[in-house]
A protein has these predicted regions:
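Phosphate/pyrophosphate-binding catalytic cores of soluble transferases and nucleic-acid-acting enzymes
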Residues: 1-272
């Protein structure tokens, strides 16, 4: 998975070493617990070398778990899960999602309305624990270790500019061979459509196209819509985060502004 994830080129990866890229195959599960364990290992190794780890990415749930710890959640209940799945089959996923919005609006706001697996799990947690997911006790995260984690985020103030950039990036991915990339994955792992990796924006829409469920034009429109929704959820999440320093992504002096901020700050770990 390279084109749809905007993976850096091998030259850039050689010039700027990254961790946790390309470490799993498509059918393999990579849980938030797996991520936190590996991320903390590489963070500690980087700090031992007296360097500042830079955490870069867009998966806010994983970043939050790394900072605050992983919620101590109740184990899955197969009988309850099947009951909820039956409800979805009978009434549709949107009905269960609306139920989640009433039970746990914070979690609902963070979950894609089409993400069946996460919606089922969130409702299950609320029922089993009697609490919202955010109210469950957390294991220790980086925020409790004494390190200074500085958070920065980039914003695009004009929504039209943001949507234009999304459309431009989508066209670049299509031109770079996104459809062929998914076709290759589908050929190697024909049973992987339901895996978390294939639910990523872009991959699931292309898979639908390859199954002749939608034509190319609809596929492109669906990817654009899903990407805009994802961007909106990410911005909503970040706006509720405490201690985030914002920079205008359209600013001509963006690089120098961020550099000045980094040089002036007392930072142990940098999150972006």
């Amino acid at each position: 998975m390279e084109i749809g994830t905007a993976r850096l080129s091998e030259d850039l990866l050689a010039q700027f070493p990254h961790h946790l890229i390309g470490i799993r195959e498509v059918p393999e599960i990579f849980s938030v617990g797996d991520f936190c364990t590996l991320a903390r290992f590489h963070i500690n190794e980087t700090l031992k070398r007296e360097r500042i780890p830079l955490l870069v990415g867009g998966t806010m749930f994983y970043f939050s778990a790394l900072l605050r710890g992983i919620p101590n959640l109740p184990a899955a209940d197969p009988a309850l899960r099947e009951r909820l799945a039956h409800e979805v089959r009978q009434s549709g996923l949107d009905t269960l999602y609306r139920r989640l919005q009433k039970m746990d609006p914070v979690s609902a706001n963070r979950i894609d309305p089409n993400d069946r697996q996460r919606i089922l799990r969130a409702v299950e947690i609320n029922i089993l624990s009697g609490k919202q997911v955010s109210e469950c006790e957390h294991s220790d995260g980086l925020d409790k270790t004494g390190v200074n984690v500085s958070r920065i985020s980039l914003s695009v103030s004009d929504r039209r500019t943001l949507h234009r950039r999304i459309d431009d990036r989508l066209r670049q991915m299509i031109d770079a061979g996104l459809v062929d990339e998914v076709r290759g994955i589908r050929s190697r792992y024909p049973q992987s459509r339901g895996m978390p990796a294939m639910k990523s924006v872009g991959y699931q829409q292309v898979w639908s196209h390859l199954e002749n469920e939608v034509d190319e034009g609809q596929m492109i429109a669906d990817i654009a819509t899903a990407t805009r929704r994802l961007a909106k959820r990410q911005l909503t999440w970040l706006r509720h985060e405490r201690g985030v320093t914002w920079f205008d992504a359209s600013s001509q002096g963006l690089v120098s502004s961020v550099s000045r901020y980094l040089n002036a700050a007392d930072i142990s770990i940098m999150g972006h």
